[in-house]
């Protein structure tokens, strides 16, 4: 994990964040994933202080590992990621737009935890998302 600096602070703030699709609908297919990565890339360009470390999905939820500076709340970062990706995916994929005529595509809430010394285990866990033969959690060192 890299130490970063602002004008008056130095920090290492990495988070593991998970959120699901609204109604747990399984639309995060392999062909949707490149578009999701592209829009998150645009979010990172718009907000260069956010650093996306890793990302992976299962059919109905998304895991990201991200660095967020202390002057930006986790809620604000998640709100940007969710709102921009929701609008883009609805525009790009008609089936998603018809699935969610009433608004956003993501569930209202999210899970977040800080990452410290277990960064490598979190990376492995995220990398294994969506795999059919995911090893037991204990084999990853949790």
Model-derived features with residue positions:
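Basic nucleic-acid-binding interfaces
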Residues: 1-142
């Amino acid at each position: 994990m890299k130490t970063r600096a602002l004008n008056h602070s130095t920090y290492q703030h990495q988070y593991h964040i998970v959120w699901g699709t609204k109604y747990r609908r399984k639309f995060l297919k392999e062909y949707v994933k490149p578009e999701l990565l592209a829009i998150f890339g645009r979010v990172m360009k718009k907000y260069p202080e956010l650093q996306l470390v890793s990302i992976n999905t299962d059919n109905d939820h998304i895991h990201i590992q991200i660095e967020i500076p202390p002057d930006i709340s986790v809620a604000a970062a998640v709100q940007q990621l969710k709102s921009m990706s929701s609008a883009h995916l609805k525009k790009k994929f008609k089936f998603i737009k018809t699935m969610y005529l009433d608004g956003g595509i993501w569930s209202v809430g999210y899970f977040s935890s800080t990452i410290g010394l277990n960064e490598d285990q979190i990376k492995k866990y995220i990398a294994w998302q969506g795999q059919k033969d995911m090893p037991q959690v204990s084999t990853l060192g949790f």
